Amino acid sequence: LLVSHTFVKVRLDFLGSANRLVRVQKLLQTQILPVEKSILWDFVSVPQNLNEIPPPDMAFEIVGDHPERAYAGLLLEYRVKIPLMGWTPWLTEIKYVEEGVSFVDEQRVGPYSLWIHRHSLLEVEGGTLMTDEIRYALPLGPLGKISHFLFVRRNLESIFRFRRQALEKIFSN
């Protein structure tokens, strides 16, 4: 598990509001799974399979119908239960797909000011290297900074550790 956090200030424009600087965090996880890239792609590119990899204590559900495969322009709606906030809607858009190699999802509505998640696969000796690279920023200025320090960072790390273990279990055979 390789998790890193970097602090980068970027200028964002939210729905026509004045530009502002935000602190962007980066979470990076890599893992090698003992499976062919095409088999792993067939799993990670199916929206329904998102239900297979969150921790059991994380309340997460996909809302509505979803297609068999992710494609550029696809909007996916979820409900996520966040401590102290309750059920929160989350809408992501698949912005980019390179079939069999990678895709990028970006939050459109949800708990973050910024959420960009790049999923990529690379054939390596012994299987497939899967990389999750997430760039995210929290709203609420100093309060967001405090919540990141107190629980958001650890919660994300825990979610991705569980996801790593779930994928190892799914593809261990």
Region annotations inferred by a language model:
Residues 33-35, 80-84, 96, 111, ...:
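Beta-strand elements of well-folded, non-transmembrane domains
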Residues 104-158:
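Beta-strand/loop substructures that line and gate deep hydrophobic ligand-binding cavities in soluble
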Residues 158-166:
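A non-catalytic, amphipathic alpha-helix used as a structural packing/dimerization or gating element
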Residues 61-109, 165, 169-173:
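Glycine-rich portal/gate segments that line the openings of hydrophobic small-molecule binding cavities
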Residues 4-9, 13, 20:
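Short, positively charged and aromatic/hydrophobic N-terminal segments
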Residues 40-44, 50, 76-78, 94, ...:
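Hydrophobic pocket/interface hotspot
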Residues 26-28, 87-91, 113-117:
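Short, surface-exposed coil-to-beta transition loops
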Residues 14-71:
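Hydrophobic ligand-binding cavity/cleft-lining segments
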